[in-house]
Design a protein with these regions (language model features):
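Flavin-dependent oxidoreductase catalytic cores
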Residues: 1-369
Length: 369
C-alpha cells in the first residue's frame, strides 16, 4: 500500500506509480488494497472506492493505462478489520492511532496488539452491510474499466480474520471447523462474482499459513483454495502470515513458493506466488517447474519501474511492449544488454583466483628406466 490517498482518493502519486510500472513493461499491475468503505481503511492514507471522486480518479488511471500501454490492471478490494485505524506505515506499522481512530470490526473481539483497539465481533447486520460495500465497490470497479478483480482474504484483515482459528473464536455457524470459517468470506466472494462480469477474471489473496501453532494448517489451506475454486475463482494469490503479531515466519528467497506449489498441484487451482522473488531467473525457475501460473514482484518494481523491460533485455527479448515515446530508450537498452553481459563474464573470468593445483605434466611419473 502507498498510504498516500487524501480522503480515500488516489492522487498524483498513485497515478505516476501505477502508470510507470505499466509503461515499464509489466503485463499485469495490481493495485494496493483498496478499501470498500471509510471504516474499512487500515490507515487514514488508504485508497478507497466508495465515492464518486474515488471512482473518477481510478477511472482516469485505467483509461491512461489502456491507451498508452498493453498492461492489464487488477483492482484489489479489502477491509482492514481489526488491523484498521492504525498509523501510516512509516509512522509505526500496525500501531493504533493516537487520535482520530474509528471503531473497528473483526470475526471476534481479539485485538492485534494488547494495546490495540479491541474490535467488535461482527453481527449478522454487520456482515450484510460489509458484503454490500464489497458489491458496491465491485460495480464501481467495472465502471472504471478494471480488467481483473482480487478479493483480499489474507494478512489478518477482516475476511482473513474469519479464516484463521487464531482470530476466529466464534461459537456460531461462522466459527469452529474450516467449513464454517469459510462461510462469510465465500458469501462475500459469491456476491462480488455475481456483480462482476463473467468474462473478467477474479482472484483471491490468502495467507496459506499463520506461521503460528494453532493457526491454519495445510489441510485448511487446501480446503480454502478448493472452496474458492468451486465458487468461481480463477486464481489464488498465495501469501502467508501477518495474522498475529507474535508469528514466527521463516524468511528466505522465494520462501512462500512451497504453498503456491501445494495449492496448484494438490488442489488443482491456478496460483500466483509472491514474496522475496527478486530476479527474472527466479521467476522463470518457478514457472518452468510448474510451481505457479503467475509470479508477482513488488519490491523489485519499487526500485525500478522498468524492471520487466530490463529483464526482457537480459534475455534478448525484443517484442516487449513499450510506449513509442520511449522506443529510443528501449533500443539502447537492448543494444547494450548483450555488451554488458559479455563485460560481466569477462570480469568474472579475470576475478577468478589462480589455481595452485599441479599441472598435468607434474603429475606424470618420471621415467626411471
Amino acid at each position: 500500500c502507498l498510504y498516500s490517498a487524501d480522503g480515500g482518493v488516489p492522487g498524483d502519486f498513485h497515478f505516476q506509480h501505477y502508470a510507470a510500472r505499466a509503461m515499464g513493461g509489466a503485463g499485469l499491475v495490481f493495485t494496493e488494497m483498496t478499501c470498500v468503505a471509510e471504516d474499512a481503511r487500515i490507515t487514514p492514507g488508504c485508497a478507497g472506492l466508495w465515492t464518486d471522486a474515488q471512482e473518477a480518479a481510478w477511472a482516469r488511471l485505467v483509461d491512461f493505462t489502456h491507451r498508452h500501454t498493453q498492461a492489464k490492471l487488477c483492482l484489489q478490494l479489502g477491509h482492514a478489520g481489526r488491523k484498521g485505524a492504525t498509523k501510516l506505515m512509516w509512522d509505526g506499522i500496525d500501531q493504533p492511532l493516537e487520535a482520530g481512530a474509528w471503531p473497528i470490526l473483526s470475526a471476534s473481539a481479539v485485538p492485534y496488539f494488547p494495546h490495540s483497539q479491541v474490535p467488535r465481533a461482527m453481527t449478522r447486520a454487520d456482515m450484510d452491510r460489509i458484503r454490500d460495500d464489497f458489491v458496491a465497490a465491485t460495480r464501481r470497479a467495472e465502471r472504471c474499466g478494471f480488467d481483473m478483480l482480487e478479493l483480499h482474504c489474507a494478512h489478518g484483515y477482516l475476511l482473513a480474520s474469519f479464516l484463521s482459528p487464531l482470530t476466529n473464536i466464534r461459537d456460531d455457524e461462522y466459527g469452529g471447523r474450516i467449513e464454517n470459517r469459510l462461510r462469510y468470506p465465500l458469501e462475500v466472494f459469491a456476491a462480488m462474482r455475481a456483480a462482476w462480469p463473467a468474462a473478467k477474471p477474479m482472484s483471491v489473496r490468502i495467507s496459506a499459513t499463520d506461521w503460528k501453532d494453532g493457526g491454519l494448517t495445510d489441510g485448511d489451506c487446501l480446503a480454502i483454495a478448493r472452496a474458492f475454486a468451486a465458487a468461481g475463482v480463477d486464481l489464488v494469490d498465495v501469501s502467508t502470515g501477518q495474522t498475529v503479531q507474535d508469528a514466527e515466519p521463516v524468511y528466505g528467497r522465494m520462501f512462500q513458493v512451497p504453498w503456491s506449489d501445494m495449492i496448484r498441484n494438490e488442489a488443482g487451482v491456478a496460483t500466483m506466488c509472491v514474496g522475496n522473488i527478486t530476479t527474472a531467473d527466479q521467476v522463470n525457475t518457478i514457472l518452468g517447474a510448474g510451481r505457479a501460473d503467475l509470479v508477482a514482484l513488488a519490491r523489485p518494481h519499487l526500485a525500478n519501474p522498468s524492471f520487466t523491460l530490463h529483464a526482457a533485455a537480459q534475455y534478448g527479448v525484443r517484442d516487449i511492449a513499450c510506449p513509442p515515446q520511449y522506443l529510443w530508450g528501449k533500443d539502447a537498452l537492448l543494444r547494450n544488454a548483450s555488451r554488458e553481459q559479455a563485460d560481466l563474464r569477462e570480469l568474472r573470468l579475470k576475478a577468478r583466483p589462480r589455481s595452485h593445483a599441479p599441472s598435468a605434466d607434474a603429475l606424470v611419473s618420471p621415467n626411471v628406466g
